[in-house]
Amino acid sequence: MAIKIKVAHVIRVFSYGGAEVLLREFFAQPEFKAQIISDVFVLDHKKLGLKDDVTPNINKFYYYKITTWRFLFEYIKFLRDIKKGNYDVVHMHLPVAGWMGVVAKLFTSKKTKYIYSEHNLVNFYSKYNYYLSGWTYGFFDSVIYVSHEVGEVIRKVQKGWFFKTHHPVTILNGIDTNKFHCTHRYELKPAETLTIGLVARFRPQKRVERWAEVAAEVHKKKPNIKFLMVGDGPSDDLLRQRIKELNIEGVIELPGMLTDTYTAYKRIDIFLLTSDFEGLPLALLEAMSCGCVPVISNVGGIKQLDFGGIGYKFDDFNPSEIADKIVAYTQNPDQYFIESDRSRDFVIKYYSLTKQVNEIIDLYRELMK
């Protein structure tokens, strides 16, 4: 039997963003638990929403107060904890965790390998994240791209040491298709109503104010259609202000962030995403696995999703045209059911979580040789 690998997973927040939720799913997978001893390091103590979810499946959970006046003390404590852990692998997820975490390489054994997962298109990062990431990439022993588009952008911005990568690999995001499976679709009556939904962290790139604009157009054309936006985040106030300006207060249900996203997907029939950029959105794959039909902006890693005949990808944001595509499903229910089935089949075929987990474990073992 192979020796278990001891891994420190480092991330800035541990709430309900795609990368965080994906980690939660990793830790619950039998293959991962059988081969990996996982410790979690969260740099911002204010956002620990998934802590209780992962505790049964990991070894230790650490968190720090880097957003307080104690920043320097907390950062030193973090570096000491990484050193004491004597890890085989330190796996960092998203910026901040990447450029703060890799400093620990100065204090740990050469046998410890440092891996960074890039979940987004770096050219859309804030200036400080962009430059700090670019200057520290060369210290990682391997960089994982979660989509082909993510890797293409990195290659375009590389210049000398800037975004220099060692052992880059593309490992596509995957989901647990057994967990995200809804069997109630054929009970729907699309001719009467559908529910348009979103499950996301309301970050600026999600452009949730545009989501509200589409909802307003759909509501004018088909008042019976319902709307559900599950999430919270920095753009929450912007969203609510736009809803008020559009005079659709009370039209969109806003329950905040839910721990059980599967329950949300069961209620959603059409998954609407109006982002400016994406790596490979986990929530989209989860929604499609549940049979939700995607209506999404054709940006970033979404471009690589070759699912002709399923939903609608838009290159230009035109709320009225997008609304027409959505309303058309109420006029042709049979087409909705066909595309719902195709959505799930597509994810099962190409984006299995088991495949992703095994590829990451293989990478760990390869680097340890």
Task: Give the residues covered by each predicted segment.
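A conserved mid-protein helix/loop that constitutes part of the nucleotide-sugar donor-binding site
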Residues: G17-E25, L194, L198-K220, F227, ...
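Aromatic "clamp/platform" in nucleotide-sugar-dependent glycosyltransferases that forms part
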Residues: M257, D276
